[in-house]
């Protein structure tokens, strides 16, 4: 660690992104994410196979060539909005998991914050400004042709000299008080020479930095998208590529068995193929003849929530759906009740179904991967007093079973492609009458109460975010699923697995 002029008050800071704000100095896995999410499996594999070449270029100090090769393979032929979409919806989660809190402690104590990265600016800017509260982001600039496609080239000839010049232009006539850079002084941190004081990561815990009152935690990532669970380092990416053929076969077997076996038998058979269901609490008995059914109010983690609930109960419980694909409906082993988003019509549908028996509803209206619960719709509380809260959670190793940007019809397939998917179900006690609308409580009070007890059970936090908030952040729309023709759906499947034809 090198430190100069330790007494300087840090009102402005210029920090390198890779290896300083992020603990890991290697940006390869983030280009792999762009390749997979924006271009597809083939581009993902090509970039992985070029990793030894990229590593050799780095070792022999051809760092600009290594960077340009990564950028070219990951981005050529894409439209810039596709890269922006990945940077908005996918990358922030992986960046946040790698943020050095010691660096953040120093960075956040300064009033003016500048981030310098060798990656394309479009890949970093949104995260840096929204989550790290950076004022400026200096990175490489992608060249886009007149047809709107990225050429895979960048405007900078010498990336590090360009960064130095742009930092100097940003602080014309004055010097930034503090510079943060990689552990060793390299060409990529030559902008530190402009700073009155500079520190090399790792930042010491007892470093006396700036204005302590300005420190804030990074804005958490509540919504994120993308299919990959783990950051695709070269080793992880290779394992994923090797697993995919076996995963597809395993998913087909699991889905077939789920369709032909009795519901009560599925949890036992699933253990043979690596699945596991953990049940806590006491499930209620089926409703007696002539009595209205129980409304199971579940947290919403994946499309499989109501299906797994039916497996555990050993009987088919219809599920209220807000917006799912036709393929998901076809594959579902339980009946689905599609809502219209017209309040009176939906209320009548739910009441009618409850008169026949039990029903499952997920009042968040959409899934959330992080340990947060979205705002609960209060409609369910108006329609019945027989409410059983159910806390649902799941763990997967390779692939997420939800998407906001992709085709939802592949959600169950990706779920069953995981080697050892685990579901946890906790049945809470049925709400007492004094906690329902029958005692004079408002539907919103009941919904908020159910949200709180479910969040407490899972160790999650309650939020006021809605499905519209989620889809506006991740996909730039309101989350409505359109019903495509069979040809359009097949095109979507092909584009998911082979979208390298840009």
Swiss-Prot record:
Membrane topology, record value: Multi-pass membrane protein
Catalytic reaction annotation: sn-glycerol 3-phosphate + an acyl-CoA = a 1-acyl-sn-glycero-3-phosphate + CoA
Motif HXXXXD motif location, chain numbering: 300-305
Pathway: Phospholipid metabolism; CDP-diacylglycerol biosynthesis; CDP-diacylglycerol from sn-glycerol 3-phosphate: step 1/3
SUPFAM superfamilies documented for this protein: Glycerol-3-phosphate (1)-acyltransferase
Any Pfam family matching the protein: HAD_RAM2_N
Organism superkingdom: Eukaryota
EC number(s) on file: 2.3.1.15
The entry's keywords: Acyltransferase, Lipid biosynthesis, Lipid metabolism, Membrane, Phospholipid biosynthesis, Phospholipid metabolism, Transferase, Transmembrane, Transmembrane helix
Tissue spec. comment: Weakly or not expressed in roots, leaves, seedlings, developing siliques and flower buds.
One GO cellular component term: membrane
Location in the cell: Membrane
GO molecular function terms noted in the UniProt entry: glycerol-3-phosphate 2-O-acyltransferase activity; glycerol-3-phosphate O-acyltransferase activity
Single biological process term from Gene Ontology: suberin biosynthetic process
Chain ranges passing through the membrane: 31-51, 237-257
Entry similarity comment: Belongs to the GPAT/DAPAT family.
UniProt comment concerning the protein's domains: The HXXXXD motif is essential for acyltransferase activity and may constitute the binding site for the phosphate moiety of the glycerol-3-phosphate.
Cited PANTHER family: ANCIENT UBIQUITOUS PROTEIN, GLYCEROL-3-PHOSPHATE ACYLTRANSFERASE 5-RELATED
Function: Esterifies acyl-group from acyl-ACP to the sn-1 position of glycerol-3-phosphate, an essential step in glycerolipid biosynthesis.
Name of protein: Glycerol-3-phosphate acyltransferase 5
Organism: Arabidopsis thaliana
Native organism taxonomy: Eukaryota, Viridiplantae, Streptophyta, Embryophyta, Tracheophyta
């Amino acid at each position: 660690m090198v430190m100069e002029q330790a007494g300087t008050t840090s009102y402005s800071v210029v920090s390198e992104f890779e290896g300083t704000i992020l603990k890991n100095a290697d940006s390869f896995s983030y280009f792999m994410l762009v390749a997979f999410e924006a271009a597809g499996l083939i581009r993902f594999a090509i970039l992985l196979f070029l990793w030894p070449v990229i590593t050799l270029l780095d070792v022999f100090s051809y760092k600009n060539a290594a960077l340009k090769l990564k950028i070219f393979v990951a981005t050529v032929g894409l439209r810039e909005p596709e890269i922006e979409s990945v940077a908005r919806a996918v990358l922030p989660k992986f960046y946040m998991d790698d943020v050095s809190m010691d660096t953040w402690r120093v960075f956040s104590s300064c009033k003016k914050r500048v981030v310098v990265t060798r990656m394309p600016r479009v890949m970093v800017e949104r995260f840096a400004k929204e989550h790290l509260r950076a004022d400026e982001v200096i990175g490489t600039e992608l060249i886009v042709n007149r047809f709107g496609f990225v050429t895979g080239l960048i405007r900078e000839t010498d990336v590090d000299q360009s960064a130095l010049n742009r930092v100097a232009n940003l602080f014309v006539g004055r010097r930034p008080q503090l510079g943060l850079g990689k552990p060793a002084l390299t060409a990529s941190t030559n902008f530190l020479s402009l700073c009155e004081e500079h520190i090399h990561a790792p930042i010491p815990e007892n470093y006396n930095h700036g204005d302590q009152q300005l420190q804030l935690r990074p804005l958490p990532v509540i919504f994120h998208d993308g299919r990959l669970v783990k950051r695709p380092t070269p080793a992880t990416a290779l394992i994923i590529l090797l697993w995919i053929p076996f995963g597809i076969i395993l998913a087909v077997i699991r889905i077939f068995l789920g369709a032909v076996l009795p519901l009560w038998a599925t949890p036992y058979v699933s253990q043979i193929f690596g699945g596991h269901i953990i049940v806590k609490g006491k499930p209620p008995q089926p409703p007696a003849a002539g009595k209205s059914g129980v409304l199971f109010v579940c947290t919403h983690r994946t499309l499989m929530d109501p299906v797994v609930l039916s497996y555990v109960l050993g009987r088919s419980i219809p599920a209220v759906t807000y917006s799912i694909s036709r393929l998901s409906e076809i594959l579902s082993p339980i009946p689905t009740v599609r809502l219209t988003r017209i309040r009176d019509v939906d209320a009548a549908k739910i009441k009618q179904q409850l008169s026949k028996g039990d029903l499952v509803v997920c009042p968040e209206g959409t899934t959330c991967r992080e340990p947060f619960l979205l705002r609960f719709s209060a409609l369910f509380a108006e329609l019945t007093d027989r409410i059983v809260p159910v806390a649902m959670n799941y763990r997967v190793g390779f692939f997420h079973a939800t998407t906001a940007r992709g085709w939802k019809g592949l959600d169950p397939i990706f779920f069953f492609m995981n080697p050892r998917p685990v579901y946890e179900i906790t049945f809470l006690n049925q709400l007492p009458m004094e906690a329902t609308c029958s005692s004079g409580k408002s539907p919103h009070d009941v919904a908020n109460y159910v949200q709180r007890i479910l969040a407490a059970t899972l160790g999650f936090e309650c939020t006021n975010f809605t499905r519209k908030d989620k889809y506006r952040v991740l996909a730039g729309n309101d989350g409505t699923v359109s019903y495509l023709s069979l040809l359009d759906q097949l095109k979507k499947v092909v584009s998911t697995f082979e979208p390298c034809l840009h």
